[in-house]
């Protein structure tokens, strides 16, 4: 027959084994949770680095696009100015020829004996 004290000691040892088993299980779960936390943190860090790199690449592409747009716009402005200047010159020449022809028609002169009309001379009828 087992004494009461031995039973009590056996129950205490059993409780200690259960507590020890729970501690071991808890430590394992905490280690697993910590490893998962570290893995998630590493993934987030990698994603943050990738996002930063993509943002830097986008910024470079944006600067390149803006630079190209500015250059194209400047070229278009230069072309427009050249076209405007050429059109103005053509209009001056057409007006000069019109004045000369009108003077010749009014005075009945031919081109060879008509008075020379300077480019900036206003027409006087």
Swiss-Prot record:
Predominant place of localization: other
Protein keywords: Gas vesicle
Record's GO cellular component terms: gas vesicle
UniProt-annotated location(s): Gas vesicle
Family assignment from sequence similarity: Belongs to the gas vesicle GvpC family.
Function: Gas vesicles (GV) are hollow, gas filled proteinaceous nanostructures. During planktonic growth they allow positioning of the organism at a favorable depth for light or nutrient acquisition.
Listed name of the protein: 17 kDa gas vesicle protein
Species this protein is from: Dactylococcopsis salina (strain PCC 8305)
């Amino acid at each position: 027959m087992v004494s009461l004290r031995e039973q009590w000691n056996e129950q205490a040892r059993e409780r200690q084994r259960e507590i020890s088993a729970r501690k071991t299980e808890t430590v394992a779960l905490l280690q697993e949770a910590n490893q998962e936390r570290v893995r998630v943190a590493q993934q987030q860090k990698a994603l943050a680095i990738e996002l930063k790199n993509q943002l830097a690449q986008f910024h470079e592409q944006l600067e390149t696009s803006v630079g190209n747009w500015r250059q194209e716009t400047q070229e278009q402005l230069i072309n427009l100015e050249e076209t405007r200047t050429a059109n103005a010159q053509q209009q001056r020449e057409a007006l000069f020829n019109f004045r000369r022809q009108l003077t010749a028609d009014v005075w009945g002169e031919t081109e060879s004996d008509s008075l020379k009309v300077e480019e900036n001379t206003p027409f006087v009828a």
